[in-house]
Amino acid sequence: MLQIAICDDEQYYRKKIQTLLTQYFYHKDLEYSIQSYPSGEVFLSQRENSVKYDIVFMDISMKELDGIQTASQIRAFHSDTQLVFVTAFIDYALEGYKVNAVRYIMKDTLDTAIPECMDAILHKMRLAQVRFSFIDGDATLYTDNILYIE
C-alpha cells in the first residue's frame, strides 16, 4: 500500500490534491492511504509515529516552516521518499533541486500535472523493486531497503 502525505497550508489545495489522487488511484486500481497536514510543523510532529511516506506533496510557501525546510528534514530520515513540490510561485523552482524533488507542479496546472507526475513516480518506484520468493511466500522489496540476503 502506498503511503502518501499532502502538506499545504491552504485547505482548498489539500482537498484538490487528495481528490485528484483518489481519482487517479481509482483508475489504476492501487491501494493507497492519504494523510493531509496543514503545515510543515504538524507534518514533522507526526514523525514520532514512524510513518514513512512513499510520496509527499508539499507546498513551498507556508508560514513559519516552509516546504524546502520541511523537505530537508524529511530527507534526513527518508532518502527514498518521492517529494513533489506544489506551489503558486515559480520563483522557488531551483530550491527543489537541493532536496532532490521529483517534480515541481504549479497549482494552476494540478488537473493535468498530477496524473503525469504519478505515472512517472510509479514507474520509478517499480524499477526499484524486486520480487523474492521466501518459505512463507512471495514478497516485493525495494532494492534500497535490502542490506543483506542469505
Residue ranges with predicted function:
Residues I6, S36, F85-V86:
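Conserved SAM-binding loop
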Residues S45, S50-L127:
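CheY-like receiver
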Residues Y26-S39, Q46:
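Short hydrophobic/Thr-rich beta-strand motif most characteristic of the beta2 strand and flanking loop
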Residues P115-E150:
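Conserved binding/recognition cores within well-folded domains
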Residues L2-L21, V56:
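Conserved acidic segment of CheY-like receiver
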Residues R14-Y24, F43-L44, A71:
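Short, well-ordered amphipathic alpha-helices
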Residues L2, Y32, T81:
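Switch/coupling loops of ABC transporter nucleotide-binding domains
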